[in-house]
Amino acid sequence: MNFERKCSVMGRKMKFGCLVKKGVAEVRERDLPEVGPYDVLLHMKVCNICTTDYGQWLGLREHQGYPMAGGHEAAGIVEQVGEKVTDLKVGDMVATGYEGCGHCPACREGHIDQCEEIRNDTEDGYKWGFFGFSNYCVKNSSGVYKVANDLNPSEAGFMEPLATVIHGAKKLRLKPFETVVVIGAGTMGLINAQTAKAYGCRVIVSEMIPKKIETAKAMGFEVIDCNESDPVEKVKELTEGIGADAVIVAVGATSANSQGLEMLKQNDGRMLLFAAGYPVPELKVDSNL
């Protein structure tokens, strides 16, 4: 399978959002690549701002490099398909994710985001060349997923982050009636909370920002207001001194990592470090326990 894309000789252009340095974004224009045999041309409809993109905007992830043409949580409409594409057609609503070759060791293990064959940096110098923040883009069909045409594009754009959450839930081995604490009620924290609830778990959300507390409560979750009580002690109180079966740390902070460990029950407690943080959060574990 050939993933190389040549610049179009037809002269068609694409416009896209690009981070050029900390706190500076531009709308740029480049040649729209040719649609290869395994590619699709997408008319983009929506793209979420991931922590990866926002962190780069804040200057917290500058190791990723500039200029950054990110945007991997996106959705759009198929406008053209390559001759080898059989599972998509013009007019399909699709969500985008990472692309994989399907045959390297990482892909065979299901880690297509770490594919050894496909690199998202482009030949014309753009880092993280997902181009989700564009009017049109060409994607390999391996990273495009058909969704219902009547699905709101804004909802379809959540397919990739939801997939990461479900992957984490599987790693945690969540079971019905378990108590799960989610530290952080941001977008990803609440998706984690909703997923744990769908597994049949009792979900407790810990948060300190008033607006996020209100949102979590409006969604029906038990909420610990960290401004009013110690979250570790409150979890112990709510679980009759036992602690949580699982903790999902959806905040990239050393203090959150420490709290998560202290919230866990002694036997078979599991913790998922879901959020990245910069500077890199520390995790200190007592190896004698």
Spell out what each predicted region is.
Residues 103-183:
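NAD(P)H dinucleotide-binding glycine-rich loop of Rossmann-like/cofactor-binding domains
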Residues 230-241:
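Short amphipathic alpha-helix with an adjacent loop that forms part of the alpha/beta core around
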Residues 1-75, 135:
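Short N-terminal strand-loop motif that marks the start
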Residues 33-47, 60-108, 148-150:
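Glycine-rich beta-strand-centered segment in the early N-terminal region that forms part
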Residues 73, 92-93, 106, 136, ...:
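Residue-level marker of beta-strand positions
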Residues 36, 89, 175, 265-266:
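Residue-level recognition of short, solvent-exposed, well-ordered loop/turn junctions
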Residues 149-229:
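Mid-domain Rossmann-like dinucleotide-binding core that forms the NAD(H)/NADP(H) cofactor-binding site
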Residues 253-289:
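Glycine-rich phosphate-binding loop and adjacent beta-alpha segment
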